[in-house]
Amino acid sequence: VAGAARHAAKCLALGFAVAGPRWRDNATMHPDHDTILAATQTWLTRAVIGLNLCPFAKAVHVKNQIRYKISQATTPEALLEDLIAELTLLRDTDPEVVDTTLLVHPDILGDFMDYNDFLDVVDAAVEELELDGILQVASFHPDYQFSGTEPDDIDNFSNRSPYPTLHLIRESSIEQAVQAFPDASDIYETNIQTLRKLGHEGWQKLWQLGSDKA
């Protein structure tokens, strides 16, 4: 759990710490690509943008600069291959075309502790590709839990997503965002206040509105 919090801090600094509904990864369900994509985009539009949990997200969403990659990996090794491919693609792609990537992997690492352990592999991949200072990876999971919290604490929802997800971020985009929003360091606390005020009941009502389209 502590390791997960360390990785989450990267994303929290950007203010992209968002709450996700309690969808759970279940490999036996084998949700199709469209279902996974729709759930992820609904999470983005309602939590990240709709609750203004990330002031920076709306622009890249409107400009269609977010890449959604639904991994079919069923082993950590296959997921690592997808991660390396996506890191390389993001590195080599014009930010005006793809600014950030959400690598969603519904059929692997559904257990949060396994996911947490895999984050060390993620760090090693970034280092091996010599992308330190260029790209970073933040973490989201349906059962995300910060150290020192109870599983159902609303604070944990700041990093809960429909499916296990790795968020690939450009360091340059973080720098630009922080310059554009001088109070960026306060976003995490603001998000926690928003979630606590909303509460579990309010959160559940938010997800009873049906599906969104990207």
Describe the role of every protein-language-model region.
Residues 29-214:
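Expand to "…catalyze enediolate/carbanion chemistry for C-C bond making/breaking, isomerization
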